UniProtKB/Swiss-Prot annotation:
Disulfide-linked positions: none
Subunit structure: Component of the signal peptidase complex (SPC) composed of a catalytic subunit sec11 and three accessory subunits spc1, spc2 and spc3. The complex induces a local thinning of the ER membrane which is used to measure the length of the signal peptide (SP) h-region of protein substrates. This ensures the selectivity of the complex towards h-regions shorter than 18-20 amino acids. SPC associates with the translocon complex.
Taxon lineage: Eukaryota, Fungi, Dikarya, Ascomycota, Taphrinomycotina
Gene giving rise to this polypeptide: spc2
Name the record gives this protein: Signal peptidase complex subunit 2
InterPro entries with a match to the protein in the record: Spc2/SPCS2 (IPR009582)
C-alpha cells in the first residue's frame, strides 16, 4: 500500500469492518444516509426551481425569486454540511443485534512513524446505557505488503475484541 494513501487505507479497513459485522448477524441501519439524502434533496429543490424559472420566464423574473431561493439553498447546504461533519461525523456503521444497538465510529490515525496503529471507537448501546470501547491494532498486523487486508488476520484480531461487545 502506498505509504501516504490514508484514504485508501481507511476505506479498505472500514469496508472490511462493515463486512465483518454484517457476516456476524448484525442488521445495518441506514438512518444517517437516509437523512443525508433528504437534506441533499432539500438543497436541490431551490436550485431546480431557480433553473426552471429562468428557463421558462428568463432572468428578469428570476431576480425577484432569488431573494427567497438563495437563503433556502444556503440553509439547506449548511444543514447538509453540519449533518455530514458533526452529526454523522466519522460513523462507519450503525446496526442492531438481539436488542443491542452498536454504533461504530472509526477514526483512523496513521501517523508518519514506523509502527502506526489504527484505532476504532465503538459505542455500544444496551438498555439506554452507552459503553465506549476502543480497539487499536498495528497496521502491519492486518495489512499485507501489497496493501490488501489479510482477512484471516483481521477476523482473528476483531474476533478477540468482539467478545467484549457481544457480552
Amino acid at each position: 500500500m502506498p505509504k501516504y494513501n490514508v484514504s485508501d487505507f481507511k476505506s479498505k479497513f472500514d469496508k472490511e469492518l462493515t463486512n465483518h459485522f454484517n457476516k456476524n448477524g448484525y442488521k445495518q441501519s441506514f438512518v444517517f444516509e437516509d437523512i443525508r439524502l433528504l437534506i441533499a434533496i432539500a438543497c436541490i429543490i431551490p436550485a431546480g426551481l431557480a433553473f426552471g424559472i429562468e428557463y421558462v420566464y428568463g432572468f428578469g423574473v428570476l431576480k425577484s425569486y432569488l431573494k427567497y431561493l438563495l437563503p433556502l439553498y444556503f440553509l439547506a447546504s449548511c444543514l447538509l454540511t453540519f449533518w455530514s461533519s458533526v452529526v454523522k461525523g466519522s460513523t462507519v456503521y450503525v446496526a442492531t443485534k438481539k436488542e443491542r444497538h452498536i454504533k461504530i465510529s472509526a477514526d483512523t490515525f496513521l501517523p508518519l512513524k514506523n509502527k502506526p496503529l489504527i484505532t476504532t471507537k465503538f459505542t455500544v448501546l444496551k438498555n439506554r446505557n452507552a459503553v465506549q470501547l476502543e480497539w487499536s491494532v498495528p497496521v502491519a498486523h492486518i495489512f499485507e505488503e501489497d496493501g490488501q487486508i489479510s482477512s484471516a488476520t483481521f477476523e482473528a484480531e476483531i474476533s478477540k475484541y468482539l467478545s467484549q461487545i457481544e457480552n
